[in-house]
């Protein structure tokens, strides 16, 4: 086959060759920051820019002017309903985090108010959650023993909360939300399910009234600890009372029944919301009247009341554990953000509005920073409480403020009434909330759609269940990264054919009716990048196709011999030096076989780099086309090659 014709190539090809230079590297990295709504505004006046900035920072300013008494009535009802669920759950989650009960209540006061001012979700309910509480109780004790040094443990938790808030704020300001996406939906489903089972097993301590328990979180260690502790307390002289189990199981059945009724009949949405508070009131009254604490029933005892005390002086910012606090804070920040954004977006989709992920990160970060200064630990959006808030008919984030005020009144007026609350009730409240964290239906859906995603789901589940939270997260992230890496080093390289009666060229494997052109091999690289990781694979794959094509058509001589390779680069957004080198080597090997090479629709960054590397000059500018159809037509009309 002779070389390509030298006639002037079409104007459409010039559009590709003369496209503007892509943005510089600095703009690519700093562009998202400059585009951040918190720092830019199209307004010309400084006053208007200031108002726009405040409206972006505090979304409440954009809707408070249209807030009505009718909306407040709905938010008031939602907030009170939310508080009835939040108060007992907050106490239980504080116990799960190995903190005194009041710290769970503190966490339901300040963070919800900050979020109501800065958050963009109307339905999300803020406060302590089970997964983050367990995360802290499994990671922080590895640094400081909560039993031997309770004050230092509590102070380290506040420091972790500060770092979590700082990381979350940085993610929002720098628009780094993609970091949260590394924990995929499938991995999150597995992680939540594994965490729910581990949390449930840990509640056996309170449900059975055990005094000795393991600090490990894996299922095997917890079950072993339950057996040995229970056997030791029953056979030894220690006073073990089955009343803890009786009280806990009785109210657990009541809570699960209330949850079942509320799910079956939406008119009774309020029943599972008030059931935990009702359980606390009834069980406390029963223990008080029967003097159950004198008969072995473990009770909460003293709960400190009053407004959140300052914890600024308790932060450990210059001690030996700052590094560990930052590490745990980063993990907590990502887990908390992932759960909150997933919850917020699911309900925003139901209501038909957009949830700004970066604003959510900023709001979450600011509320946790404020929380760390006011004796709170890491808070986020709770799925169970958000569902209750939604079902109660909330209209805005004011329901969070109503809930916070109600919890504050509880702290001021009613904490002394919690003295006789049995620990088994806290365990039963947490256990009743766990079924919502296990989504078997979604896991089955993941299995049907993507087996690799299901592997990440299983990895996170079994890692959390049988090893630890960190290992479960590490396994999930490793599988997710392996999936990304596998897709990067083994990109799709497809042979294209023309769909009859159209100008469309599609994968012949997917569309068997697609017709290939004799002597012309059209190939598409279905990858975002041609780089060092996959360039060799792409080069060898194309050469293998040329050899296979020639071998299959050896009896047809010139008619079957490949005369031209057309590479469709429409999907290719970037190429590095290794990718360019692979293209040059491919071009040389094709020339040695008498095969010409052409490119179709290289994106602007790709064509810019190919021109700078002189690759376009090497293959000839007339071999760059806008569409596959134009490239094939040029070949057939002898612009590309003389007919055999």
From Swiss-Prot:
CDD domains: STAS_SulP_like_sulfate_transporter. Keywords: Membrane, Transmembrane, Transmembrane helix, Transport. It is a multi-pass membrane protein. Its main location: membrane. Gene3D superfamilies: STAS domain (3.30.750.24). Residues 511-635 form the STAS domain. It comes from the Eukaryota. One of its GO terms (molecular function) is secondary active sulfate transmembrane transporter activity. The chain crosses the membrane at residues 50-70, 76-96, 99-119, 124-144, 156-176, 179-199, 242-262, 268-288, 328-348, 394-414, 418-438, 455-475, 518-538. It is found in: Membrane. Pfam families: STAS, Sulfate_transp. InterPro entries: S04_transporter_CS, SLC26A/SulP_dom, SLC26A/SulP_fam, STAS_dom, STAS_dom_sf. Residues 1-20 are annotated as: Disordered. The keyword Transmembrane helix applies. Belongs to the SLC26A/SulP transporter (TC 2.A.53) family. Low-affinity H(+)/sulfate cotransporter which may be involved in the internal transport of sulfate between cellular or subcellular compartments within the plant. This is Low affinity sulfate transporter 3.
């Amino acid at each position: 086959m002779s070389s390509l014709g030298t006639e002037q190539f079409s104007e459409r090809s010039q559009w590709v060759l003369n496209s503007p230079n892509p943005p510089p590297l600095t703009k690519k990295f700093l562009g998202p920051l400059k585009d951040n709504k918190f720092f830019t505004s199209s307004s010309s006046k400084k006053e208007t820019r200031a108002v726009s900035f405040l409206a972006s920072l505090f979304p409440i300013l954009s809707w408070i002017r249209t807030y009505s008494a009718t909306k407040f009535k709905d938010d008031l009802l939602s907030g009170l309903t939310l508080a009835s669920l939040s108060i007992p759950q907050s106490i239980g989650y504080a116990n799960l985090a190995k903190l005194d009960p009041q710290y769970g209540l503190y966490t339901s006061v300040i963070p919800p108010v900050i979020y109501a001012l800065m958050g963009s979700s109307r339905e999300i309910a803020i406060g302590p959650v089970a997964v983050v509480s367990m995360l802290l109780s499994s990671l922080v004790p590895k640094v400081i023993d909560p039993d031997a040094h309770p004050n230092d443990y509590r102070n380290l938790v506040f420091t972790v909360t500060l770092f979590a808030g700082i990381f979350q704020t940085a993610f929002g300001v720098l628009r780094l939300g993609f970091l949260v996406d590394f924990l995929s939906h499938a991995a999150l489903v597995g992680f939540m399910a594994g965490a729910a089972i581990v949390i449930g097993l840990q509640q056996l301590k309170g449900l059975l009234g055990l005094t000795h328990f393991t600090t490990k979180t894996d299922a095997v260690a917890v079950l072993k600890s339950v057996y040995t502790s229970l056997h030791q307390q029953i056979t030894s002289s220690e006073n073990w009372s089955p009343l803890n189990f009786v009280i806990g199981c009785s109210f657990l059945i009541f809570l699960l029944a209330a949850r079942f009724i509320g799910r079956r009949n939406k008119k009774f949405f309020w029943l599972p919301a008030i059931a935990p508070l009702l359980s606390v009131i009834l069980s406390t009254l029963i223990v008080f009247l029967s003097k159950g604490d004198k008969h072995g029933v473990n009770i909460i005892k003293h709960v400190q009341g009053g407004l959140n005390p300052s914890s600024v002086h308790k932060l450990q910012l210059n001690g030996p554990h700052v590094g560990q606090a930052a590490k745990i804070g980063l993990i907590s920040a990502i887990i908390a953000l992932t759960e909150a954004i997933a919850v917020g977006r699911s309900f925003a989709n139901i209501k038909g509005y957009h949830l700004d992920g970066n604003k959510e990160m900023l709001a979450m970060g600011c509320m946790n920073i404020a929380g760390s200064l006011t004796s709170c630990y890491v808070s986020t959006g709770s799925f169970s409480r958000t569902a209750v808030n939604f079902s109660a008919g909330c209209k805005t984030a004011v329901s969070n403020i109503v809930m916070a005020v109600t919890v504050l009144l509880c702290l001021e007026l009613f904490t002394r009434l919690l003295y006789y609350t049995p620990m088994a009730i806290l365990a039963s409240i947490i256990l009743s909330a766990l079924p919502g964290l296990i989504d078997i239906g979604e896991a089955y859906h993941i299995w049907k759609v993507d087996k690799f995603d299901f592997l990440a789901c299983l990895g996170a589940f079994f890692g959390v269940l049988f090893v630890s939270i960190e290992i479960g997260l590490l396994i999930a992230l490793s599988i997710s990264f392996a999936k990304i890496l596998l897709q990067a080093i083994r990109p799709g390289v497809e042979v294209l054919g023309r769909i009859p009666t159209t100008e469309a060229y599609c994968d012949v494997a997917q569309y068997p009716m697609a017709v290939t052109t004799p002597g012309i091999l059209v190939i598409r690289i279905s990858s975002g990048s041609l780089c060092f990781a996959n360039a060799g694979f792409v080069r060898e794959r194309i050469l293998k196709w040329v050899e296979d094509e020639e071998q299959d058509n050896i009896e047809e001589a010139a008619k079957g011999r490949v005369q031209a390779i057309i590479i469709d680069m429409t999907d290719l957004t970037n190429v590095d030096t290794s990718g360019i080198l692979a293209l040059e080597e491919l071009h040389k090997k094709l020339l040695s076989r008498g095969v010409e090479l052409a490119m179709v629709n290289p994106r602007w960054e790709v064509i810019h780099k190919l021109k700078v590397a002189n690759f376009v000059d090497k293959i000839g500018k007339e071999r760059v086309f806008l569409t596959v159809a134009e490239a094939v037509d040029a070949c057939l009309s002898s612009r590309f090659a003389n007919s055999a």
